[in-house]
Amino acid sequence: MKPKLAVYWTGSCGGCDVSFLEVGEAIVEVLSQVEIAFWPALADSKKADLEAMPKGYIDAALINGAIRTQENLEMVRLLREKSKLIVAYGACAHLGGIPSLANLYRREELLKAAFGDGWRPGPPPGAPQEDAPPELLPKALPLAQAVPVDYTVPGCPPPAGLIGEFFSAFLSGEMPPPGHVFAKVKALCEECPRTREERVLKKIVRPHEIVPDPEACLLDQGIICLGPVTRGGCSAACPSAGMPCTGCLGPTPKAGDMGLSMISALASLVRAGEEGEAAIPKEDEILNRLVDPIGTLYKYGVPDMPCAKEGEG
């Protein structure tokens, strides 16, 4: 009997659903070996269909997106009940992702910015109550803060190699212990083709401000690259293409808190050409060139940021 698979999106952009195509022709072989039990982005699947399934009917549910609305929360709880395994698929489900940057603002601030002062909760004028949009939760949550998660396939979106690793393990019945993250333990720098020589930071520049040397380490050139604190597993796709790593595969086990670890790394690398106390003002000047520290260092992981707002709303 074929294993039953579910794929569901919550607060996401849709890129994770499209990412299955990155596997190429191999996805045809994967789909031939599973039964799609529930996948609204691919087939006409309703909540009622899911509710009618017995507990544990689905062998694995891959959920992408942050938990942003009450409906998201209800659906993932329902999927947890109906599934033997829950997989956090992609950076938003894993860490909170881009949607979690909204946690820096209170819910009322977000709604006012989007809809203006006249916005009120509920259905549009003249529409029935069932047409009301789902209630916005006070904060965007990673999947593990909503339901127990068994496995994680990280990335924005997950790279083809990691998708393949997951399905190889799943279809063979040789899954690793629960809690496993389908990515490397070592940092992305370990698989980056760029050459690191100076290991010092003499300046900070934004990617559009220079034409980077195609062979040299981006950090050595002053571009903030999160490769030192990010899990490997994507073959350093962004640095290989001339763009810095933004941390979408999540922190290495050693790094823990990605932002704090990267700040520590930058502080140890910065060199102003001075010694002792005379260097402090110039080193501060270099570090102050870091534009949008939160968006840079916690682009995908605001829920784990120690100083994030509570955002009650």
What are these regions (language model features)?
Residues C92-P99, G118-W119:
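Short gly/pro/ser/thr-enriched loop/turn and capping motifs at secondary-structure boundaries
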Residues A66-R68, C92-H94, P158:
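Short glycine-rich anion-binding loops that position phosphate/pyrophosphate groups of nucleotides
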Residues E71-N72, G96:
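Extracytoplasmic/secreted cell-surface and envelope-processing proteins
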Residues M1-L62, N72-L73, R77-L85, L104, ...:
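Iron-sulfur (Fe-S) cluster-binding modules
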